[in-house]
Amino acid sequence: MMITLDHVTKQYKSSARPALDDINVKIDKGEFVFLIGPSGSGKSTFMRLLLAAETPTSGDVRVSKFHVNKLRGRHVPKLRQVIGCVFQDFRLLQQKTVYDNVAFALEVIGKRTDAINRVVPEVLETVGLSGKANRLPDELSGGEQQRVAIARAFVNRPLVLLADEPTGNLDPETSRDIMDLLERINRTGTTVLMATHDHHIVDSMRQRVVELSLGRLVRDEQRGVYGMDR
């Protein structure tokens, strides 16, 4: 099992209602899962728990071999090396080229220069940006910037890719291209967990759907659509 949440509850002191309430979810290696639900349903907390950015109030969180809520200090970066993250707002380094943005993800974990020089061009080819390695982010379209962000998340070949509204700032055609790319990455064996509000993407792809509402798990459905009655 790649991801396990076992009776996980997260209670913030500032709220009377738990952000997550007794959540039980298991995700296998290589699955593609949509995490859906309205704002405030607990999606962001769910993902932050996987990254050890939050600690559950009760229950167990596991990612691959990592017992996440028992990790301490120096072990947290080891967990994050096996998880790639993609966000709605790209979060690129504006003064670095496409190549250097992707290479930076390997530099910070101490990869050798020869390995970086070998792997980065391969990943840029995968995301369709081989010809734009020397461009700066402000010279790219929104879709191209998201491709850079995906390349950066994938360059270390993570076991899990977390995508938080990766198409939220993109037009429908560009969104479809980004989803095609995420599907290709998923086919390499990477587990993909994507939080989204995009009905059209969820309905067209018919992947597993995990739905949260007010911190509770209300649906876990294979080949699901966005709404239960659609």
Curated annotation (Swiss-Prot):
One CC-aspect GO term: plasma membrane
Main location: membrane
ABC transporter domain segment(s): 3-228
GO biological process: cell division; transmembrane transport
Topological type in the membrane: Peripheral membrane protein
Keyword field contains Ribonucleoprotein: no
InterPro entries assigned: AAA+_ATPase, ABC_transporter-like_ATP-bd, ABC_transporter-like_CS, ABC_transpr_LolD-like, Cell_div_FtsE, P-loop_NTPase
Cell compartment(s), UniProt: Cell membrane
MF annotations from Gene Ontology: ATP binding; ATP hydrolysis activity; magnesium ion binding; manganese ion binding; transmembrane transporter activity
Pfam family, any one: ABC_tran
Binding residues annotated for ATP, in chain numbering: 37-44
Record's function text: Part of the ABC transporter FtsEX involved in cellular division. Has ATPase activity.
Record text on subunit structure and interactions: Homodimer. Forms a membrane-associated complex with FtsX.
Family to which this protein belongs: Belongs to the ABC transporter superfamily.
PANTHER family in alphabetical order: CELL DIVISION ATP-BINDING PROTEIN FTSE, IMPORT ATP-BINDING PROTEIN
Protein name: Cell division ATP-binding protein FtsE
Species annotation: Mycobacterium tuberculosis (strain ATCC 25618 / H37Rv)
